[in-house]
Amino acid sequence: MKVALVGCGAVTQAVYVPLLSRRRELFEVAAVCDLSATLAGAVGDRLGVARRHTDLGEMLAEGGFDAVLMLASGSHGEPVRQALAAGYAVLCEKPLALTEAEVAALPEGRLMVGYMKQYDPAVRRAEEMLAELGGAAVIRSVEVTVLHPSAEAQLGFANLSQARDVDVAPLRAAENAVLDRALGAEAGPEVRSVYSVALGSICHDLSLLRRFTGSPVKVDHVETWGGLPGSIEISGPLPVAGRYSIRWHYLEDYPAYRETVVVHHASGSLELVFPAPYLMNAPTVLTAVSGAETRAEYREVTEAFETQLLAFHAFVTSGKPPLTDAAGALEDIVTAQRIAARYAVQHDLALGGEAGDR
C-alpha cells in the first residue's frame, strides 16, 4: 500500500520512520510533506523518498498513493478534510480536531484516528479480562496518574532533525483562532492550557475510558496547580457504574514518563503501567490482582504503534473497522470541552465558543 506522510516532526522521525522502514512488505512511502523543507528533506532521505512537498494541496493533487498518514501537530481538521475530499484513506494522529465544527465539516470517507494505546496488547488483554468479569457494570473506579517529563527529556535519544526554516507565528495565530471557536476569544491562558492538555495528552486516557466503560458524560471537578501546564486533576461519574479520576502532572525534570491506569472492580484490580511512548517495543505491564491476593503479570513487546499501523492497513485493504473513527474522536473533543467548562465555572473564568454550551 502506497502512503504519503504529512508532518515530519518528532513523532514521525522517532516512531513512524523506523516502523515504516521495517514493514516495507506492507507500506511504500511515496511522498512526504511538511511546511519545513528541511524536515521533509530529512525524512525523505531516511526513507529514500524522492517526492518532497511543502504544500499539502499540491501533494494531494499530484497523487500516486493510496492513503495519507496525518502526523503533524495541532488540529488536523482542515488537512484531513482536504485528504478525504481528494478520495484518500486517512490515518490521523490524535487529536482529530480542536472543535466539533471541524469534525462536522469532514466529508464521508475512510478515516481512522490514531490512539495507539488502544492497540497496546496489554490494553486489549485488560479489555478481555474486564469483559469476562462482567464489563463496565462491575467497575468501582478507574484511576489514572500521568507523570509527564518535558518532550526534550523523552526524545533526547532520538537525534531529531529540527525545523528552523518556518515562521511559527502564523501557525500559532491559526491555532489560536481555532481555540477561540472552541473556548471563546475571551478564554484566558488557564482555560486554554487545560483544554490543550486534555486534547493533547489526557485524550489517551479518555480513549481508554471509551474502551473500558464508554466516554464520561459528566465532569464533576477540575483543579490545577503548580503553574502552567502544571498539574491537572479531573473526576466524575462513569456512564454505567463507578467513578473516574485523572491526575496529570507535568514534571519537566522527572526521570522518565510514566502512566498508570488502574481499574478497581468488586473482586480485584487491573493495573496498566505504560512506559514512555517513544521507546519502541518497551512493554506495557498489566497486573491483575484477584482472590487470595493473587497477582498475575502480563507483558508483551509487540509495539502498539506498529499494531495500529497494521490495523490501518487492514482498514484500507479489507475494510476492517478501526477502534476509533470520527465519532469516537468527537467524543473526546466533547469531553475535553466539558473539562474546560467545569474548570471555568469552578474558578469563575471567562468561557464561550463550543465549550460554553457544555
Predicted regions span which residues?
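Oxidoreductase and adenylate-handling cofactor-binding alpha/beta cores
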Residues: Y119-E143, G156-F157, A182-E186, V191-R192, ...
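Charged, glycine/proline-rich intrinsically disordered loops and linkers
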Residues: E152-V191
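Short active-site oxyanion
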Residues: F27-A31, D66-V68, S196
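Beta-loop-alpha module in the N-terminal Rossmann-like domain of NAD(P)-dependent dehydrogenases
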Residues: V49-L106
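Contiguous beta-strand/loop segments that form the cofactor/metal-binding neighborhood of enzyme cores
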Residues: P189-Y278, R299, E306-K320, Q337, ...
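N-terminal Rossmann-like dinucleotide-binding module
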Residues: M1-L47
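A contiguous active-site-proximal alpha/beta segment in oxidoreductase catalytic domains
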Residues: A97-V168
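C-terminal helix-rich "cap/oligomerization" subdomain common to oxidoreductases
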Residues: A67-L69, G109-R110, G226-L228, A311-R358
